Amino acid sequence: MKKFNDWLEKHNLRNIPTLIVVVAFVLFVFMTIAFLNHNDEDSSTIYITEDAELRTGPSAAYPEIHSIDKGQNFHKIGKTGKWIEVVSSNNKEKGWVAGWHTNLNIQADKNPNAKPLKDKTIVLDPGHGGSDQGASSNTHKKSKEKVYTLKTAKELKALLEKEGATVSMTRESDTYVTLDDRNIKGDAYISIHNDSLKSSKANGSTVYWFKDNQKALAETLSASLQKKALLTNKGARQENFQVLRQTNVPAVLLELGYISNPTDEDMITEKLHRHIVEQAIVEGLRAYFSE
């Protein structure tokens, strides 16, 4: 006790008002430091620490809504991987921003050249085949769906293998495979088709999913197709297809254009355009497995 009294005497703190001022100052310094260092991921308000982009979904594959400037703040409403779902203070705009552009101290991937598809098993299912030709066009080309789903799958397989993925195919030639036999396990399952209607006006691509664990893959691939491909994008939709229903892995069914539409048919049958679509699928898979 004597030592404490001596310490108070030495620092002239026996005066109660002086002691109160010192304590208040210490508390102020402590609270200021705590505020400046605050980066709790559970905080409802986030701050943009460098110029960034607000996107429609949780990856760079999703379309950009608009750019956002350093210093802006948003309310945090969700989080997927390293991406934060935000809404503006006036609730007028909503989207996703990369966490490494915020005060949440989320680190960007250290190696941007890493291959997220390395050692992943991707199942490619070229629709139809053999006696089941699928849809066909009414133009002079008389294009058959089974031919171009297989071409697309083979070309896509080569691109995915360059990314380090292992690719399994439900068919590799013009053979008929039952829907039950198409149920092959992998890290992702992609069934490839072309759409068709009696009307030649219908056009565009659609990505279908059925189970909850398939939705994120569908939305990511749809966003990548919208960003890269020339086909009209109809988005990601839920549908009870058997190939999606019978598997427990993330799976999608891609309708890559209407073979009944002459413009879409040209894009389906031209290798250069197929390559653009295939590259969009690869980029979508990269984005999906990066999260």
Curated annotation (Swiss-Prot):
Belongs to the N-acetylmuramoyl-L-alanine amidase 3 family. Probably involved in cell-wall metabolism. Pfam families: Amidase_3, SH3_3. One of its GO terms (biological process) is peptidoglycan catabolic process. Its EC number is 3.5.1.-. Keywords: Cell wall biogenesis/degradation, Hydrolase, Secreted, Signal. It comes from Staphylococcus saprophyticus subsp. saprophyticus (strain ATCC 15305 / DSM 20229 / NCIMB 8711 / NCTC 7292 / S-41). CDD domains: MurNAc-LAA. This is Probable cell wall amidase LytH. The keyword Kinase does not apply. PANTHER family: CELL WALL AMIDASE LYTH-RELATED (PTHR30404:SF7), N-ACETYLMURAMOYL-L-ALANINE AMIDASE (PTHR30404). It is found in: Secreted. Coiled coil: none annotated. Residues 1-40 form the signal peptide. The keyword Transmembrane does not apply. Residues 109-146 are annotated as: Disordered. SUPFAM superfamilies: Zn-dependent exopeptidases (SSF53187). Residues 41-105 form the SH3b domain. One of its GO terms (cellular component) is extracellular region. Residues 122-286 form the MurNAc-LAA domain. GO terms for molecular function: N-acetylmuramoyl-L-alanine amidase activity.
